[in-house]
Regions:
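Conserved, mostly hydrophobic/aromatic
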Residues: 80, 142, 155, 202, ...
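Glycine-rich, aromatic-flanked loop segments that form ligand/cofactor-binding clefts
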Residues: 143-179
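N-terminal secretory signal peptides and thylakoid transit peptides that target proteins
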Residues: 1-18
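Metal- or metallocofactor-binding catalytic centers and their adjacent structured scaffolds
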Residues: 62, 78, 82-154
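Shared catalytic-loop signature of beta/alpha-barrel
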Residues: 95, 103, 130, 256, ...
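Metal-dependent enolase-superfamily TIM-barrel catalytic cores that perform enediolate-based chemistry
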Residues: 168-285
């Protein structure tokens, strides 16, 4: 017998006077979240504070560079201000950056990034036809560089530009990312990650990834979940990510196992665009269900939040188009008392996660860290740090890189 009530049972118990109940057996109150008009109003709240920039910051150049395996977007204003971002490594998107994005931004005032430019970029030369990873990743690269430039110009960190920092250190989990391991090999690897990073939480992969209910190997997921709890102990929090592996019928037994071990959440149990299937799983579990890594539509995020299709929203800071778009999702989620725990991509992506987490009110219990801090730590002053399961938020202006010239010196220009 299940020891935990489902989410619907919890919601039903909180209803003092029962409203109309339809043939589904669930109340209208149980099915609905905030009004969509209220969610739209929350999303539209301005985030970017450019009040300290009292003169135009006209974008003069945007370049794509490569050095030591990293790709950079470097921006410069007509008065010599500069900023830099690191991409998530998708060089094949270069033509979109070169032909459709850079020409739009050059000559524009960077201060209008939120109020005007991002919306107009979407319309420019029918860019909306490319929405999804192809457009939003490229938009994010430029946005991150412009935020860095604006932060440097006024002496504010990205978190302070985006409404103000409210925390200076972030709890993280470390993710395995493997499916080629046996359960025994996987828990051994997870323990090594904990030993290496000091993480207080881990995430492992379940199912076969977009696999129509097949496991990576027969019985792997069912064995891995209890073994992870036994091997890692109660002091380590667990997360499970199915990467769209299951339909609801097959997701629920996996979710029950995660409930039994007290997991933090069950990520993307069903195909990412099967919103109703994901909601069916979420409605049947007490365990929080998360999703949104592959989402690119604000209106579908709004549906998830309004209909409680997930319990935790997870926009990817690259795939979803940057921090400003992701902050709109966080604003809607906050109205619904729902955490926003961003997904990250790219080796440097954890730095953008730190800035976003530093300013988001309900960021959830843990953020993802994909390791590799030592590659970038000394770019910052003080250096990036990791200890006791926490990452420090960079404190310098913009993204916090101390010396752009030193970081990109000798880079090869791709665009």
């Amino acid at each position: 017998m299940r020891s935990q009530p489902t989410r619907r049972e919890i919601l039903a118990a909180s209803v003092v006077s029962a409203p109309f109940v339809g043939c589904s057996g669930t109340s209208q109150r149980e099915e609905s979240g905030p009004d969509t008009g209220d969610l739209d109003a929350a999303a539209a709240k301005p985030v970017l504070d450019v009040s300290a920039l009292d003169t135009p910051l006209i974008i003069d150049s945007i370049r794509l560079l490569e050095k030591d395996g990293d790709q950079f977007v470097h921006v410069r204003s007509k008065d010599g201000a500069e900023g830099v971002s690191l991409t998530n490594g998708r060089r094949y998107l270069g033509p979109i950056l070169q032909d459709l994005v850079i020409p739009f931004f050059v000559g524009k005032d960077a201060r209008k990034l939120e109020s005007e430019l991002l919306f107009e970029l979407y319309r420019h030369r029918s860019n909306y036809k490319l929405q999804g990873l192809a457009l939003w990743s490229v938009q994010a690269w430029v946005e991150f560089a412009l935020l860095d430039m604006m932060g440097r110009a006024c002496g504010k960190s990205i978190g302070d530009l985006l409404g103000g920092t409210i925390r200076d250190e972030i709890d993280f989990y470390v993710a395995s990312g493997r499916r080629d391991s046996t359960p025994e090999e996987e828990v051994e690897y997870l323990q090594a990650l904990v030993d290496e990073t000091g993480a207080k939480a881990v995430k492992f992969r379940l199912g076969g990834r977009m696999s129509r209910n097949l496991d990576a190997s027969p019985g792997r997921s069912e064995s891995l979940i209890p073994l992870a709890r036994k091997a890692l102990g109660d002091a380590i929090d667990l997360h499970g990510d199915a990467n769209s592996s299951y339909d609801p019928e097959h997701a629920l037994p996996i979710g029950r196992l995660l409930e039994e071990v007290g997991a933090v959440y069950f990520e993307e149990p069903c195909p990412f665009d099967h919103l109703e299937d994901t909601k069916a799983v979420a409605d049947s579990l007490a365990l929080p269900v998360s999703g949104g890594e592959q989402e690119y539509s604000e209106r579908r995020f709004r549906w998830m939040i309004a209909n409680r299709g997930v319990d935790i929203v997870q926009p990817d800071l690259h795939y979803y188009g940057g921090m400003l778009r992701s902050a709109r999702v966080a604003n809607m989620a906050e109205l619904a008392q729902m955490p926003t725990t961003v997904h990250i991509s790219g080796g440097f992506g954890f730095v953008y996660m730190l800035h976003f987490a530093s300013r988001t009110k309900d960021i959830g219990r843990y953020q993802e860290y994909k390791r590799n801090i030592e590659r970038y730590a000394d770019w910052f002053d003080p250096p990036l740090w990791i200890r006791d399961g926490k990452l420090g938020v960079p404190t310098g202006p913009g993204v916090g890189i101390r010396d752009i010239a030193a970081v990109i010196g000798g880079a090869r220009e791709l665009i």
